[in-house]
Amino acid sequence: MSDISKASLPKAIFLMGPTASGKTALAIELRKILPVELISVDSALIYKGMDIGTAKPNAEELLAAPHRLLDIRDPSQAYSAADFRRDALAEMADITAAGRIPLLVGGTMLYFKALLEGLSPLPSADPEVRARIEQQAAEQGWESLHRQLQEIDPVAAARIHPNDPQRLSRALEVFFISGKTLTELTQTSGDALPYQVHQFAIAPASRELLHQRIEQRFHQMLASGFEAEVRALFARGDLHTDLPSIRCVGYRQMWSYLGGEISYDEMVYRGVCATRQLAKRQITWLRGWEGVHWLDSEKPEQARDEVLQVVGAIAG
């Protein structure tokens, strides 16, 4: 798309970053100054009744800056990147029609990618093919299937661990159904986002500082009643660890503790470690992201001013 035709598109802002990097605080500050409306880009914040462990904006913050796409699913329900793209596009169109600018804030990089580039045309799951793969795994082991994937799609095999049956099974399933590799299909994008997007990523300059923040925030969540929040979910009886909601960082570890699998101290240790790993994955995504303007979360006023400098012209 030419620069001229791109300039005629409606404007949007992406504010991305790892967990515990200060995205929400900056988004709220920006809303005071720019004509923006916030859309949450977070696969955990979509769930009702999961507030403390997801660091969902509190009532005061939501009053100052309402977020769209919060609390839109029960924890028993699934929600895909395709669902997000559909919902986000509808919200963006609504915001643009009102003469304002969508500010998308969050850390679920897959959602940002799906929104920006469109979704690759992957085939739907096929229960028969999946059953055949699982049968083969039961007979030969997942290591054997991983070797098979290495021959079919070495790029995907390098990214998928042999102990990750869900992703391994999906990569093989895609090939058996379509005759094309997962790598081949994911390089084929769908419809690109029809907006002129200004992209920002916020993070502390040092990894140690981020790790420190993550640990502090996990302990803060525990002090705020995180255990009671998960106990209420645990007591429902219809939720389990195969659901995306319960696999969320922190919830999975607390679930293991409540189920008597690990001690409280082990839960805290694993919860902090899992959150650090999540942040590492988010930063890895962002380092390979094109056209992103980096902000230092330890200098919030400077970060705000940098955003205003880049997008200030669109506020008029």
Curated annotation (Swiss-Prot):
UniProt-annotated site: Interaction with substrate tRNA, residues: 108, 130
EC annotation from Swiss-Prot or TrEMBL: 2.5.1.75
Reactions accelerated catalytically: adenosine(37) in tRNA + dimethylallyl diphosphate = N(6)-dimethylallyladenosine(37) in tRNA + diphosphate
Cofactor: Mg(2+)
Record-linked SUPFAM superfamilies: P-loop containing nucleoside triphosphate hydrolases
Keyword ATP-binding: yes
InterPro entries in alphabetical order: Dimethylallyltransferase, IPT, P-loop_NTPase
Binding site for ATP: 17-24
Superkingdom of source: Bacteria
Gene3D superfamilies (UniProt xref): 1.10.20.140, Crystal structure of tRNA isopentenylpyrophosphate transferase (bh2366) domain, P-loop containing nucleotide triphosphate hydrolases
Binding site for substrate: 19-24
One record GO biological process: tRNA modification
Disulfide bonds: none
Pfam family, one: IPPT
Keywords annotated in UniProt: ATP-binding, Magnesium, Nucleotide-binding, Transferase, tRNA processing
Renumbered residue ranges of the record's region Interaction with substrate tRNA: 42-45, 166-170, 247-252, 280-287
First-level EC class: transferase
GO MF terms, alphabetically ordered: ATP binding; tRNA dimethylallyltransferase activity
Subunit: Monomer.
Function: Catalyzes the transfer of a dimethylallyl group onto the adenine at position 37 in tRNAs that read codons beginning with uridine, leading to the formation of N6-(dimethylallyl)adenosine (i(6)A).
Family: Belongs to the IPP transferase family.
Protein name, entry field: tRNA dimethylallyltransferase
Organism for this UniProt entry: Escherichia coli O157:H7
